[in-house]
Amino acid sequence: MALTQRLEFRQSQSLVMSPQLMQAIKLLQLSNLDLMTFVEEELECNPLLERASDDAAGAEAPTEVDQVSGDQLAEAQVRDARDGAMTTYTEWGGGGSGDEDYNLEAFVASETTLSDHLAEQLSVAFTAPAQRMIGQYLIDLVDEAGYLPPDLGQAAERLGATQEDVEHVLAVLQEFDPPGVCARNLRECLAIQLRELDRYDPAMQALVEHLDLLAKRDIASLRKLCGVDDEDIADMIDELRRLSPKPGMKFGSARLQTMVPDVYVRPAPDGGWHVELNSDTLPRVLVNQTYYSKLSKKIGKDVDKSYFNDALQNATWLVRALDQRARTILKVATEIVRQQDGFFTLGVAHLRPLNLKAVAEAIQMHESTVSRVTANKYMATNRGTFELKYFFTASIPSADGGEAHSAEAVRHRIKQLIESEEPSAVLSDDAIVERLRVSGIDIARRTVAKYREAMRIRSSVQRRRDNMWSTMNSRASGGTGLDK
């Protein structure tokens, strides 16, 4: 077989991800507070960029974002999605697996907060949109120590729900980790933790209900109320002291940032809804063309010319990217309001299922764009302030491409599999994934683990160990002959 050499020419098109284009994509994800910080840094380092003001001399208004730059941004996001860098709805805040240059976490450092931890459990505990909305509303009220306000009557009225609906969701929230969270006072916080430990008997209940006597060190009265002796009351008090009075503090003492809405939704005179951007969250910057023109006439060195040309290009791109970001947020928010009109008009019971794809198709944008826009953006409504992503509901895809499965149904199936497992054949999370896949449910192992933990089901290693101890204890009690 002879080897030959030949020259071939191939023509192809590809999108070059320029720094400016990467910047435009990143700006979509930033919260309004992070955006302000970013713009302040740009103002410090770019001499041609300045804040807009009524008497800004020599500054030109930002030019309309042309179709080419808009198409480039959309194409970049499509490519970004193909490369695995887009944030999907099922992994909110988790970031993608693409190049770290496109990862928001590499740009803005963050850590898990109590609110994030509770929100993650909420997504597993409820699949009904109305219950999720109530749950998120309550989570937003939780303070740094893990407590809710004593009176939640306004929550039902604000959301257009019944008091029973709110109480039902609250009862589930109070089963979340950390134990004792979402309590309305110290007594309720301690009672929740004691129930978790299966130690909330009548004597302990009496002790918790009379904490004022404990503060006064009136042990004699406590002993009488609890109906126990000196040794028991001492043990009970010691057990009470081992509980956490502030369960939320385990997540650190990071300062809570004020939630500033990006979008306002107000009733319109025609009976619809008026959606507008919060101008206070939109940095107003301009490119000072006059200053650049003066400098360009005086600059002699090529190095200096290159520096100021780059500064002009970066400033122009930033102004355009900010304008594009504002337009995109408004467009997405308006479509969400249109889709969720029932919620705004009638209340949480009328919150309809919605996904990123439905909004993306309606406004002719890519899902990755909608995903970025809905992260870290808040909407102030007549029913409270909500993050845009809360108006979406998730589902579990089918392994055979058929109809998607609800998260609640999948969670129930996982529980059934574990409850029916043989003590000698405990199912690992990987084994559960395979069982679900056979039944047509496509789910990741980490999702199975998350659902299992939210249901307070121990890991396969822990369940196997529990079975072993149970078997050993059974054999020991049956073979000692001490009952004779």
Curated annotation (Swiss-Prot):
GO molecular function: DNA-binding transcription activator activity; nucleotidyltransferase activity; sigma factor activity; transcription cis-regulatory region binding
GO biological process: DNA-templated transcription initiation; nitrogen fixation; regulation of DNA-templated transcription
RPON box, short sequence motif: residues: 444-452
Renumbered residue ranges of the record's region Disordered: 464-484
Induction: Regulated in response to oxygen.
Ranges of compositional bias, category Polar residues: 468-477
Alphabetical UniProt keywords: DNA-binding, DNA-directed RNA polymerase, Nitrogen fixation, Nucleotidyltransferase, Sigma factor, Transcription, Transcription regulation, Transferase
PROSITE patterns attached to this UniProt entry: SIGMA54_1, SIGMA54_2, SIGMA54_3
DNA-binding segment(s): 355-374
This protein's GO CC annotations: DNA-directed RNA polymerase complex; protein-DNA complex
InterPro entries: RNA_pol_sigma_54, RNA_pol_sigma_54_core-bd, RNA_pol_sigma_54_DNA-bd, RpoN_core-bd_sf
Keyword GTP-binding among UniProt keywords: no
Pfam family, one: Sigma54_AID
Summary of the function given for this chain in its UniProt record: Sigma factors are initiation factors that promote the attachment of RNA polymerase to specific initiation sites and are then released. This sigma factor is responsible for the expression of the nitrogen fixation genes.
Family matches, as PANTHER family: RNA POLYMERASE SIGMA-54 FACTOR
Assigned protein family: Belongs to the sigma-54 factor family.
Protein name according to UniProt: RNA polymerase sigma-54 factor 1
Encoding gene per record: rpoN1
